[in-house]
Amino acid sequence: MAVDKLPDFISGLRFMVAAKKHLVYFYSMKESGSPTSEQIEIERQTSLLKNIVERSYLQERVSCYVLKNIPQEGLPTYNDQTHTGIEIIIIPQVHTLTKGDQNVLVRMMMASQVSRPVRLFIGMIPWDTTKESAMSGDIELALSSRITSEDWLKHKFWFACYEPDENEVFSPLIGALPESLEKAQYTDVHANRSIHRYILDVMIHLRMHKLLDTTKGGGIHTSALRDVLALSQLLALYRFNKAFVTPEHVKLACIWYFPLHVEFLKGSAMDTSVLYGSRPELVDGLLKCIADVKLSNTVETENPLFLETIVVQDVLNKVVPPV
């Protein structure tokens, strides 16, 4: 199974609005010579993303704006709880927020699910491909996630997507549904109980994977079942035009969803096998080889979560899907 890019933003945008969830948005950015030129590039990328969102929802009650600073008092809400509009809020440089700002952002995300208007957040993270090769030799840095936010903020985001190319920017969101499915909601898509068990099996295997930090459950949190199921239903309906979920839809949903959330071992001190006789220097040697593979392939595949995707695919190859 080849490793592709991260999910396309155009599909991710439609899915996040349908499911009322939040996204991480990676965009490529070359190292600049000065802070001024770097800030100009950040603002250009932010403006481009805002234009894509606004163009996609011109005829619908969806507004979009950029939130450069996190207000400590949160965002205002409407007294009218029947308000049906949606606000999409873009947060540039979400990875640079202080712990205090991250805490406020989490509270705003939680409030957005019950208050009006419904607010959906897109966290922007630049990805500098020239810095990948500079990490060679630093195992901990190389194996660290490219998403440096605290776990309790990272898990509030649904999945990570990558900036669209020019063809995607000027193409329609997703093809029209067949007439029989035009009025269908993604929650109407049927998922058999065996599908639920399949997702749980994948979660358990990820939590126990040798390359992941088992002290954190591999990064697989309790709401993963619900999140993957919703994504599977959306993929079944909008990408495959089906009214039911199959194991293939679940596999694709897992490849989209889990790379954002998994947590890697970064040294032999984190590996529980050392307690039972594994030699720390051999564990570190293995991790160095894995880090080298990650650095050599991440840029080539244009996937900042390359190694995370490999681990998810490894688990999917081992877990037997329902028949």
Swiss-Prot record:
Role of this protein: May be involved in telomere capping.
Similarity comment text for this entry: Belongs to the MTC2 family.
Protein name, per record: Maintenance of telomere capping protein 2
